Swiss-Prot record:
Source species, domain of life: Bacteria
Gene3D superfamilies listed in its UniProt record: FAD/NAD(P)-binding domain, GidA associated domain, C-terminal subdomain, tRNA uridine 5-carboxymethylaminomethyl modification enzyme MnmG/GidA
Principal location: cytoplasm
Organism annotation: Shewanella baltica (strain OS155 / ATCC BAA-1091)
Keyword tRNA processing assigned: yes
Name of protein: tRNA uridine 5-carboxymethylaminomethyl modification enzyme MnmG
Record key words, sorted: Cytoplasm, FAD, Flavoprotein, NAD, tRNA processing
SUPFAM superfamilies tied to this protein: FAD/NAD(P)-binding domain (SSF51905)
GO cellular component, one term: cytosol
Annotated binding of NAD(+), by residue: 273-287
GO biological process, one term: tRNA methylation
Cofactors: FAD
Taxon lineage: Bacteria, Pseudomonadati, Pseudomonadota, Gammaproteobacteria, Alteromonadales
Length: 629
């Protein structure tokens, strides 16, 4: 049975990747269908109730700069906001928000339901319709076929998902949801490499059974940060505290005593878990010398008693979970509301994707989120936006787009995945980026919003606000460069008390701001130098662009050298055995990876600069030298 309408883009799955993919395609004018097994769980935060953090906050800002929903929803749902690394340089500062699950889900659903060009339909997908290596639609559980030349799969942990608690296990996509078995079996028929990964979640605790007086209170920041460039503090709901406690030697003894019934340590789970978010049993085993581990006690919302104990993700049997929880200071009488568990699921080797997130094997089929081996809401949302955008571009007959590594953390993420692949759940860190001074949270809009506007992702309101901000920054920089103060100026009496060394020669306001003891807000408060910019985002940009101008210029020069051959395209049909001069090892690796560009090829382990030179000569001789989009 065929549905009565055709769609330009179909998105399968309504998590963080799926919602951003559907919204992106619809914003660009494509007639879009979002298929989900349950409309009520669209935008669900399946694991921790938080958005942002080191590297992750940068991705959220980039999603926002391209018109996405994640940051906006976080501003409306965030019950505690903090700026991490605030004492460090701007490149590694990151915003993190504790979020009310219900408010976040509610805001995402509201955005989806009010998005033009977007239809939502509740049905699980069991099959893909593929003809001559081209996707042409999907078939749902009840045999209903939907036709489309572009399909984005954002299946999360649902593909052959298996939930483990102790030595017991059962099929599930997450707690309370069925797995996608039929779709997983269908995908295994495709010429794409498949593997298994695992992730986990901690038990949820009843707040009424916790003694918070035994814990350290952790308040949010003041003044309050915002996540979206369009956000405002007035959007935030009531702000509340989190708390900190620790495991102890007794906790560790209980965990060690239960390892024989752990699915991870008894060989029941084969999938590899996230390195940077390990289970508590993994921490105790790997860091046996540590006598305690920190636990963040995080409320799940304003109108729920559920507490998320961040740091004790576990798949141990329930009796062991209860004992280990009650061994922790402040939780001696705690009651578990939901047990912790591990979930194992299928993922597909992202090296089989183009950097548009389209599969190399099937035209029009895109993957985004955990299906590509990543972990985290932010990583999923960023991929979803890119996949939905490129699906829409393809339907419109336009070239795909993906930012370079020097343009966005999204570019780093996709390049890492499509070039190097991953054997464990991949999460973003600032340390993964070579050019992180240019890839800051604060300038994500300056880097990406103009491109988003060109692609059709950015609406009029965001574009107007961005243009106004950009103009105010430029005018203020011109003012600082054009106004001067000299030793005999009447302004000097107000200025000198704020300087480590008094002014001895004429200096521009810009030079004064560059001094280490001076910052923008301080300079603007001195009589005769203000009033300056009212918009704190614009003021921050002025300060960073002035103070770091030398470093930024140097990094830009490095990038200009590096990108000379970065985008030189490599035909996916090229058989590297035909390239004379390449070693057998290099030939095998290049034929295995099928890189899209010289830049990607150069980042594959074992591909030498000499091999790259040989490739460039071969391409030139064959008339194949071309620049990738």
């Amino acid at each position: 049975m065929h549905f009565h309408e055709r769609f330009d883009v179909i998105v399968v799955g309504g998590g963080h990747a799926g919602t951003e993919a559907a919204l992106a395609a619809a914003r660009m004018g494509s007639k879009t269908l979002l298929l989900t097994h349950n409309i009520d769980t669209l935008g669900q935060m399946s694991c921790n109730p938080a958005i942002g953090g080191i590297g992750k906050g940068h991705l959220v800002k980039e999603i926002d700069a391209l018109g996405g929903a994640m940051a906006i929803a976080t501003d409306y749902a965030g019950i505690q906001f903090r700026t991490l690394n605030s004492s460090k340089g701007p490149a590694v500062r990151a915003t993190r928000a504790q979020a009310d699950r219900a408010l976040y889900r509610q805001k995402i659903q509201n955005i989806l339901q009010n998005q033009p060009n977007l239809r939502i339909f509740q049905q699980a997908v069991d099959d893909l319709i593929v003809e001559n290596h081209q996707v042409v639609g999907v078939v749902t559980q009840m045999g209903l076929a939907f036709e489309s030349p572009a399909v984005v799969l954002t299946t999360g942990t649902f593909l052959s998902g298996k939930i483990h608690i102790g030595l017991e296990n059962y099929s599930g996509g997450r707690a309370g949801d069925p797995p996608a078995i039929a779709l997983a079996n269908r995908l295994r028929e495709l010429p794409i490499r498949v593997g298994r990964l695992k992730t986990g979640t901690p038990p949820r605790i009843d707040a009424n059974t916790i003694d918070f007086s035994q814990m350290t209170e952790q308040k949010g920041d003041s003044p309050l940060p915002v996540m979206s460039f369009m956000g405002d503090v007035s959007h935030h709901p009531k702000q509340i505290s989190c708390w900190i406690t620790h495991t102890n030697e007794k906790t560790h003894e209980i965990i060690r005593g239960g390892l024989d019934r752990s699915p991870m340590y008894s060989g029941v789970i084969e999938g590899i878990g996230p390195r940077y978010c390990p289970s508590i049993e993994d921490k105790i085993h790997r860091f046996a010398d540590k006598s305690s581990h920190q636990i963040f006690i995080e409320p799940e919302g304003l109108n729920t008693n559920e507490i998320y104990p961040n740091g004790i993700s576990t798949s141990l049997p329930f009796d062991v979970q209860l004992n280990l929880v009650r061994s922790i200071k402040g939780m001696e009488n705690a009651e578990i509301m939901r047990p912790g568990y591990a979930i194992e699921y299928d993922y597909f080797d992202p090296r089989d994707l183009k950097n548009s997130l389209e599969t190399k094997a099937i035209n029009g089929l895109f993957f985004a989120g955990q299906i590509n081996g990543t972990t985290g809401y932010e990583e999923a949302g960023a991929q979803g936006l890119l996949a939905g955008m490129n699906a829409s571009l393809q339907v419109q007959g336009k070239e795909a787009w993906c930012p370079r590594r020097d343009e966005a953390y999204l570019g780093v993420l996709v390049d890492d995945l499509s070039t190097l692949g991953t054997k464990e759940p991949y999460r973003m860190f600032t340390s993964r980026a070579e050019y992180r001074l240019l890839l800051r949270e604060d300038n994500a809009d300056i880097r990406l919003t103009a491109k988003g506007r060109e692609l059709g992702l950015v609406d009029d309101a965001r574009w107007a606000a961005f243009s106004e901000k950009l103009e105010s920054i430029e005018l203020e920089l011109q003012r600082l460069r054009g106004q001067w103060v000299h030793p005999n100026s009447p302004l000097i009496h107000a200025l000198n008390p704020h300087l480590n060394t008094p002014i001895s020669r004429e200096a521009s306001f810009e030079e004064l701001l560059r001094r280490p003891e001076m910052d923008y807000s301080k300079l603007m408060q001195i009589e005769g130098f203000g009033p300056g910019l009212e918009d704190p985002q614009a003021a921050e940009q002025v300060q960073i662009q002035v103070k770091y101008s030398g470093y930024i210029q140097r990094q830009q020069e490095e990038i200009n050298k590096a990108v000379r051959n970065e985008n030189t395209g490599l035909p996916l049909t090229l058989d590297y055995k035909e390239v004379p001069g390449l070693s057998n090892e290099v030939i095998a690796k290049l034929n295995n990876h099928k890189p899209e560009t010289i830049g990607q090829a150069s980042r594959i382990s074992g591909i030498t600069p000499a091999a790259i030179s040989i490739l460039l000569v071969h391409l030139k001789k064959r008339g194949l030298l071309r620049k990738s989009a």
